[in-house]
């Protein structure tokens, strides 16, 4: 079977997306990465996977504060901290004074400053309070909300990948701009 066989290409794209967006050891290859870069549909598929796995905590017979902790720990164990690192970089860039070159330099700096720590802390607080608000709505409703949130987030990524333009060369430039509106549909 070659990559021109539809099922193989789809499988490669989904494996590439899982390898990129999660810490699940799928054993991806360069062919998987390349298939993923051409397949915006693979992003929401991973949203269903992540939402389904992390949303499972809502079926645990625990008190709401423990549920919130289990959700956050499960989310970061499953997806890693790459997204949190990017969020901290964004917070540092927003806090810096200067021109676009100075802002880009802060984005590339590996140290986290006050702006990054503040944005990350506020974001974690908002997510924790959001999850806490699910207490009492029922396990299945909470589960469906988490799945919908993850799928929606991945659809947002697909939208940016298909319609956005990369600001500079980097990892994002390998995804953004390589697809078009037909890929999103």
List each language-model region with its residue ranges.
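Transmembrane alpha-helical segments that form the membrane-embedded catalytic/substrate-channel core
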Residues: 17-21, 73-83, 147-163
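Hydrophobic, membrane-facing alpha-helical anchors
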Residues: 18, 24-27, 95-98, 159-166
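Short juxtamembrane and helix-loop transition motifs at transmembrane-helix boundaries
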Residues: 30-38, 106-111, 169-176
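Solvent-exposed interhelical
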Residues: 155-184
């Amino acid at each position: 079977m070659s990559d021109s066989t539809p099922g193989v290409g789809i499988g490669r794209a989904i494996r590439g997306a899982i390898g990129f967006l999660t810490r699940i050891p799928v054993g991806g290859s360069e062919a998987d990465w390349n298939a993923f870069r051409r397949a915006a549909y693979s992003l929401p598929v991973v949203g269903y996977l992540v939402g389904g796995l992390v949303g499972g905590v809502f079926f645990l017979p625990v008190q709401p504060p423990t549920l919130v902790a289990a959700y956050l720990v499960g989310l970061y164990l499953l997806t890693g901290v790459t997204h949190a690192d990017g969020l901290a970089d964004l917070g540092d860039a927003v806090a810096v004074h200067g021109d676009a070159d100075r802002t880009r330099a802060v984005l590339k700096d590996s140290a986290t400053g006050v702006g990054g720590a503040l944005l990350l802390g506020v974001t974690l607080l908002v997510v924790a309070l959001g999850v806490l608000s699910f207490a009492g709505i029922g396990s299945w409703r909470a589960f469906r909300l988490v799945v919908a949130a993850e799928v929606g987030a991945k659809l947002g990524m697909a939208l940016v990948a298909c319609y956005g333009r990369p600001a500079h060369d980097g990892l994002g430039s390998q995804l953004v701009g390589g697809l078009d509106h037909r890929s999103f549909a």
